[in-house]
UniProtKB/Swiss-Prot annotation:
Protein name: Phosphomethylpyrimidine synthase
Protein keywords: 4Fe-4S, Iron, Iron-sulfur, Lyase, Metal-binding, S-adenosyl-L-methionine, Thiamine biosynthesis, Zinc
Covalent S-S links between cysteines: none
Organism: Caldanaerobacter subterraneus subsp. tengcongensis (strain DSM 15242 / JCM 11007 / NBRC 100824 / MB4) (Thermoanaerobacter tengcongensis)
Top-level EC class as recorded in UniProt: lyase
Short name of any one Pfam family annotated for the protein: ThiC_Rad_SAM
Function: Catalyzes the synthesis of the hydroxymethylpyrimidine phosphate (HMP-P) moiety of thiamine from aminoimidazole ribotide (AIR) in a radical S-adenosyl-L-methionine (SAM)-dependent reaction.
GO BP term, pick one: thiamine diphosphate biosynthetic process
Binding, [4Fe-4S] cluster: 409, 412, 416
UniProt xrefs under NCBIfam families: PRK13352.1, thiC
Reactions it catalyzes: 5-amino-1-(5-phospho-beta-D-ribosyl)imidazole + S-adenosyl-L-methionine = 4-amino-2-methyl-5-(phosphooxymethyl)pyrimidine + CO + 5'-deoxyadenosine + formate + L-methionine + 3 H(+)
Classification via PANTHER family: PHOSPHOMETHYLPYRIMIDINE SYNTHASE, CHLOROPLASTIC, THIAMINE BIOSYNTHESIS PROTEIN THIC
Gene behind the chain: thiC
Record: residues binding Zn(2+): 269, 333
Length: 432
């Protein structure tokens, strides 16, 4: 049985109990929201060392880190290092997007070494292997994509991105409404190329019931991908994007009726003034399914700093109701991220998620900031460092920017605002 089926039967699973304890909410709350499909717990029955996380209504905003090999950098060992760095930095989930080297080995090693939920885009493996087996992506038999999905599910993948909303009708909208950047989703591009070449409907849409059977067998959460997400601000919230979202909403209902957990993916590149509308549209059209957004990036002119542009958009999206942020690294739009890029991407996304959680009233988020304020008031540098979202960096600055065994910081010294006001108020003297 899936987590959704257990919830519908009124059974609180061990995964639900773990999520409730982590979030500081009741087990009954988790049960009810999983039952409604407004919380998902990606937890493949074959992911043995998983510590489950909940995604959705009333929970802390979660962060995903993308890792995986490429044709230029096929070394699996590096991706395992990235996995460990991502988890240490606070990632709540990872996705293996490997397209280079032995993609099966890469996925299995990541699952084996990951305590957090692992996601994939099965179409990547299907495309890579179709080139070697059949000569091209478009020559891939329909059967092959389902074979790959079953193989990945059997390995223990907790959630899969599937571009089921790409239909012939969606492509008509894309053709009729010109974009600056037509399609920027790799999985979406592979699917569209196959559809156009073969003049056939998307197999993942046409045979959605078959996909549901596989997902149900292993309790794989479906992450309905946005193959027509905007790749630049000018293309945001257009007819093609919304047409796909409407279809995804219909598929959400089908998945829930089949007892399969489901969430929905979103953009992308979106100007600040359109982010809230995008979230509200998704929640309305997709029946309050958990919303998983890539950023969104709020300006197109900051390559090298897109972890910042995405954090800005992510904070706004999460406050508006998005539940799951996919990180963006400084290497986005430029190349495959290295280990440091992964760390910076996770931390930027965690800051965005935490800032939104404070505004959304997530109790434990506000408590962390209160603890930091008290540590600063008490001039407790060790506590401040431990409470930091990146203790390693905070400690490095404290040690290198100040003289040893000095309470004050080098920014203010004897002109410390807290010290001056404390003397006036007659309160215990502190310095910052």
């Amino acid at each position: 049985m899936t987590q959704l089926e257990y919830a519908l039967s009124g059974i609180i699973t061990k995964e639900m109990k773990i999520v409730a304890d982590y979030e500081g909410v009741s087990e009954e709350f988790i049960l009810e929201e999983v039952k409604k499909g407004e919380i998902v717990i990606p937890a493949n029955v074959n992911h043995i060392n998983l510590v489950p996380k909940g995604i959705g209504k009333g929970l802390s905003t979660k962060v995903n880190a993308n890792i995986g090999t490429s044709d230029a950098f096929p070394e699996i060992g590096k991706e395992i290092e990235k996995l460990k760095v991502a988890i240490d930095a606070g990632a709540d989930a990872v996705m293996d997007l490997s397209t280079g080297g032995d993609v099966n080995k890469s996925r299995r090693e990541i699952i084996k070494n990951s305590s957090v939920p692992v996601g994939t885009v099965p179409m990547y493996q299907a495309a890579v292997e179709s080139i070697s087996r059949y000569g091209s992506i478009v020559a891939m038999p329909e059967e092959f994509i389902f074979k790959v999905i079953e193989e990945q599910a059997k390995d223990g993948v907790d959630f899969i991105t599937v571009h089921c909303g790409l239909t012939l009708e969606s492509l008509k909208r894309l053709k009729d409404n010109k974009r600056i950047m037509n399609v920027v989703s790799r999985g979406g591009a592979f699917t569209i190329a196959w559809m156009i070449h073969n003049e056939k409907e998307n197999p993942l849409y046409q045979y959605f019931d078959r996909l549901l059977d596989i997902a149900k067998k292993y309790d794989v959460t479906l992450s309905l991908g946005d193959g027509l997400r905007p790749g630049c601000l000018e293309d945001a919230t257009d007819a093609a994007q919304i047409q796909e979202l409407i279809i995804l909403g219909e598929l959400v209902k089908k998945a829930r009726e089949a007892g399969v957990q489901v969430m929905v993916e979103g953009p992308g590149h979106v100007p600040i003034d359109q982010i809230e509308a995008n979230v509200k549209l998704q929640k309305s059209l997709c029946h309050n399914a958990p919303f998983y957004v890539l950023g969104p990036v709020v300006t197109d002119i900051a390559p090298g700093y897109d972890h910042i542009t995405a954090a800005i958009g992510g904070a706004i999206a999460a406050f508006a109701g998005a539940d799951f942020l996919c990180y963006v690294t400084p290497a986005e739009h430029l190349g495959l991220p290295d280990i440091q890029d992964v760390k910076e991407g996770v931390i930027a996304a965690k800051i965005a998620a935490h800032a939104a959680d404070i505004a959304k009233g997530i109790k434990k988020a506000r408590e962390k900031d209160l603890a930091m304020a008290k540590a600063r008031a008490n001039l407790d540098w060790n506590e401040q460092i431990q409470l930091s979202i990146d203790p390693e960096k905070a400690e490095k600055y404290r040690v290198t920017k100040n003289k040893p065994n000095v309470e004050t910081c080098s920014m203010c010294g004897k002109f410390c605002a807290m010290q001056i006001v404390s003397e006036y108020l007659g309160t215990p003297t502190t310095s910052c």
